[in-house]
């Protein structure tokens, strides 16, 4: 007798979720990524557990790289013939995860797909894990992020640890080079799989303030055999002996790294192989290493994901490319520019930045670009971004002043003035810097000239700019690609 009300609640929750999402998308009010899940949970608190029951699930969490790593895993699983559920938009709170599973279920709330790759917010992990019972939990890294929401990084670590403890059966895939993430392997019964970089990268005198300067066990200052970036690297504590674990999956050598990707020598256990990663920058090597490790822990063949990494595409504002139509001769003449230039396309690359470590790594990536380009930096301080923007003073904007390929910098967003001040103190030539807060005018300025444009937005500014760039280039929204 108790089963009927439960089934009825599930049916109503799923129906409401699907209806709200359909309405939002058809009315042009967004992708329906979170609100449908909130509505569904009003009808049934068990709707997520019901609609995910029996599925094999990988959960990806951590400060940076969640969306990209999840995309790598989804691509590999799809290419291996599996029908995969994924929260492609990055809606990674409990409501967003609920919406994905409920909308993918049949009208009785039964899952129609066998497996899922879900990125999960660090703070939501403790809510999501006990409801979906993942087979694998991958933790990418831990950095300061949204200080007014999470507080300092140790609080974020505590929240992730609480989430991990909710499922002792899940395999933990951990970044061996991150002393904070690595500590999740202490005193947990879960099986652990480790990934990392077995080599130094870049400047061995880090220019970014460390988020993990002291040993998490005894408080002594860490020493390093080498750094990769920020506080990541081969760390060890000279006092208590806490140190980096030798990873099971690791990049041993970078054979090539350019603006479009990397070729590396990758170690899996005791064997090595050549792997091409179709996304650039050092942090994407970590994302790739984590994806390979998680794929193997999930039961997949490492060779399969190693092959798919060469063709993986950028996702939703993370190294995403747009071919923006250049201004026509008529438009240029109206704006007082030379009308003789041939209209074509302007390459635009969008790179989401939201904390000091990610921002500094993006600036490092820009230092590797051959040829001149224009730069746009956007900063909002809305709820989804975090209202505290003090982190921009810890990012390595000073390197922008050293980059002779940057021909102009446009600052935009709610806190554009703060960016302009930060660039001034970073030593950037003030004549190169302009401010444009109107997104339509910003788009028009991008279309002028032929130099490539790199855009560094934080989260809400990325959503706004991505929409106008998608409209201007005819790019479909993420849900329009789904069947």
Q: PLM features: what roles do these ranges have?
A:
Residues 119, 140, 173, 287, ...:
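Residue-level signal for inorganic ion chemistry
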Residues 73, 77, 97-101, 288-298, ...:
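Buried hydrophobic packing segments
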Residues 56, 78-81, 268-277, 323-328, ...:
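Glycine/charged-rich beta-loop-alpha catalytic/anionic-binding loops adjacent to active sites
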Residues 131-141, 232-246, 279-312:
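A conserved, hydrophobic alpha-helical segment in the catalytic core
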Residues 120-145, 184-274, 325-326:
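Extended acidic/charged loop-beta regions that coordinate divalent cations
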Residues 1-24, 30-33, 219, 232-234, ...:
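ATP-dependent carboxylate-amine ligase
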Residues 83-88, 274-282, 348-349:
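A short glycine/serine-rich beta->alpha loop
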Residues 4-196, 204-214:
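Phosphate-binding loop of NTP-binding sites
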């Amino acid at each position: 007798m108790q089963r009927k009300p439960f089934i009825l609640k599930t049916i109503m929750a799923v129906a409401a979720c699907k209806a709200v999402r359909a309405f939002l998308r058809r009315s042009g009010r967004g992708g329906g990524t979170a609100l449908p899940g909130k509505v569904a949970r009003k009808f049934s608190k068990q709707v997520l557990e019901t609609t995910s029951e029996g599925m094999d699930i990988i959960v990806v969490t951590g400060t940076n790289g969640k969306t990209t790593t999840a995309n790598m895993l989804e691509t590999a699983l799809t290419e291996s013939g599996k029908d995969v559920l994924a929260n492609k938009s990055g809606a990674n709170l409990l409501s967003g995860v609920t919406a994905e599973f409920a909308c993918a279920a049949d009208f009785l709330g039964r899952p129609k797909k066998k497996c899922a790759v879900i990125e999960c917010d660090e703070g939501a992990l403790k809510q999501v894990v006990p409801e979906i019972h993942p087979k694998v939990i991958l933790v990418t890294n831990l950095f300061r992020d949204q200080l007014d929401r999470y507080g300092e990084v140790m609080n974020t670590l505590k929240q992730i640890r609480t989430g991990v403890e909710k499922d002792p059966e899940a395999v933990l895939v951990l970044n061996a080079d991150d002393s904070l993430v690595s500590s999740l392997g202490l005193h947990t019964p879960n099986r652990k799989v480790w990934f990392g970089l077995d080599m130094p990268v870049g400047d061995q005198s880090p220019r970014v303030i460390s988020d993990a300067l002291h040993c998490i066990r005894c408080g002594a200052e860490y020493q390093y055999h080498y750094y990769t970036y920020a506080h990541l690297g081969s760390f060890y504590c000279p006092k208590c002996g806490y140190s980096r674990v030798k990873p099971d999956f690791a990049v041993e050598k970078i054979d090539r790294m350019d603006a479009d990707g990397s070729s590396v020598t990758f170690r899996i256990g005791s064997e090595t192989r050549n792997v091409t990663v179709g996304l650039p920058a050092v942090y994407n090597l970590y994302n790739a290493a984590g994806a390979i490790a998680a794929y193997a822990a999930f039961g997949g063949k490492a060779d399969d994901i190693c092959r798919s990494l060469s063709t993986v595409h950028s996702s939703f504002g993370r190294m995403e490319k747009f071919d923006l139509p250049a201004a026509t001769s008529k438009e240029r003449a109206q704006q007082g520019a030379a009308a003789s230039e041939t209209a074509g396309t302007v390459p635009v690359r969008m790179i989401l930045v939201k904390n000091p470590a990610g921002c500094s790594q993006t600036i490092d990536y820009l230092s590797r670009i051959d040829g001149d380009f224009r730069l746009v930096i956007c900063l909002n301080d809305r709820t989804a971004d975090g209202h505290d923007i003090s982190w921009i003073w810890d990012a390595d904007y000073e390197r922008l002043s050293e980059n002779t390929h940057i021909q102009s910098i446009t600052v935009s967003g709610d806190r554009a003035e703060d960016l302009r001040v930060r660039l001034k103190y970073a030593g950037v030539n003030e004549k190169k810097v302009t401010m444009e807060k109107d997104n339509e005018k910003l788009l028009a300025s991008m279309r002028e000239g032929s130099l490539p444009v790199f855009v560094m937005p934080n989260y809400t500014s990325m959503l706004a700019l991505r929409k106008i760039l998608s409209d201007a280039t005819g790019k479909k929204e993420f849900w329009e690609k789904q069947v």
